[in-house]
From Swiss-Prot:
Family: Belongs to the methyltransferase superfamily. UbiG/COQ3 family.
Enzyme Commission no: 2.1.1.222, 2.1.1.64
Lineage, opening ranks: Bacteria, Pseudomonadati, Pseudomonadota, Gammaproteobacteria, Aeromonadales
Entry protein name: Ubiquinone biosynthesis O-methyltransferase
Keywords, sorted A to Z: Methyltransferase, S-adenosyl-L-methionine, Transferase, Ubiquinone biosynthesis
Role played: O-methyltransferase that catalyzes the 2 O-methylation steps in the ubiquinone biosynthetic pathway.
Length: 238
């Protein structure tokens, strides 16, 4: 691995340690399984359907979103820097008979090899785990074809997000392992939009993602105080 790679080895180690439980619907990754249908439908709707489209999933982990997009007929490539999560992703896809590709590399490395190749690029809950999120946005702008869509989800940085994602989710409700998140690495919507625009992408839409404890489900909403998703487009010209 390039020593200059945009990778935090401590962050990688967190997910390596629990990768074997990635597809355990009641384990540490239960929130990802619960939130996936909401994300998948949003991405599908905004993309005008996924069938036949070339999609790159950056920071794919164990393949929850990657595999679900492939099931909808997309040609999916998932990339991640975690060896163990990718091993889990490959095995699960093989067991389920789902065709897609997984590669161990950074977005920047992939961009140097395959520019302008993807109709859709997704990057879910990954930017808050890398040292230089703006570098990832620049790589994404290179990877997506002109006119293509980009979907990014991350966590806002404010006291409410700290209370809900760290105190609440990690310590009180124990929805995710302690130490999963670092509040300093959270990204405000304004910061994310600026990064995207600096990379040459245009903001198309934004939505909050909210957990409803009574129904134990996630839903979309206008409030972007905590979890949120942004849709970008790469302009056809310029």
């Amino acid at each position: 691995m390039n020593s200059d790679a945009n990778v935090d080895l401590t962050e990688i180690a967190k997910f390596e340690a629990i990768a074997s439980r990635w597809w355990d619907m009641e384990g540490e990754f239960k929130p990802l399984h619960q939130i996936n249908p909401v994300r998948l439908d949003w991405i599908t709707d905004k993309s005008g359907g996924l069938f036949g489209k070339r999609i790159l999933d950056i920071g794919c982990g164990g393949g929850i979103l990657s595999e679900s997009m492939a099931r909808r007929g997309a040609h999916v490539t998932g990339i991640d820097m975690g060896k163990e999560p990718l091993g889990v992703a490959r095995l699960h896809a093989l067991e389920q008979g789902v065709e897609l590709q997984y590669q161990q590399m950074t977005a920047e490395e992939h961009a140097s090899q395959t520019p302008d190749q993807y109709d859709v690029v997704t990057c879910m809950e990954m930017l808050e785990h890398v040292p230089d999120p703006a570098s990832v946005l620049r790589a994404i702008a290179t990877l997506v074809r002109p006119g293509g869509r980009v979907f990014i989800s991350t966590i806002n940085r404010n006291p409410k997000a700290y209370l809900m994602m760290i105190i609440g989710a990690e310590y009180l409700m124990k929805m995710v392992p302690k130490g999963t998140h670092d509040h300093k690495k959270f990204i405000t919507p304004a910061e994310l939009c600026r990064m995207g625009e600096a990379a040459g992408l245009l903001v198309r839409d934004m939505s909050g993602v909210h957990y409803a404890p009574l129904s134990n489900q996630f839903k979309l909403g206008k409030n972007v105080d905590v979890n949120y998703m942004v849709e970008f487009i790469r302009p056809e010209h310029g």
